[in-house]
């Protein structure tokens, strides 16, 4: 999937570096005058949110069609069906890993201290991977029985992006909405990663627990739904 994505592209895999940087530049210009005064190290804050959400969006969108898109293979060759969404998420993870390079570049350019806390990054990435896989498996199963899922997910993912503090500070959220706002799994995972990169410290123990909770509960739900419905995939694809 990763090789196919950049097939016949002039810049090829370089787009993994350029996409987050170009997106950050545009959003930085648009939002810096509005939010920069409230957000320390806005460029790192912004790019961290972009890179994390882009991975989640790409991984789940690719997973969505992982079963129906491989209908001919599934009906002819037996392969454990969870492999299909898993490989899509893993492909997006490679792209995500490459996009961390421009993030590191921005950290250096902005002279953000790179401390030992960065070694905790794999924990945050692992939680993000688990969340994407859980949602991806749920979407892949839903797509088999309800083809409008792809269009609904396009709307939901856009709303999810605006409900996640990617380019704005959480301080602008009214206090009476914060309880609902914090039900967003990406809020906790992105916050965890930002504390590591921007503050250079280990997050509080509660942040670890929340990151695990909001990532592995969706994974458990997605895997359970996928397992219970997979025997009917062949009849509906």
Report each predicted region and the residues it spans.
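Hydrophobic transmembrane alpha-helices and immediately adjacent juxtamembrane helices
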Residues: 1-237
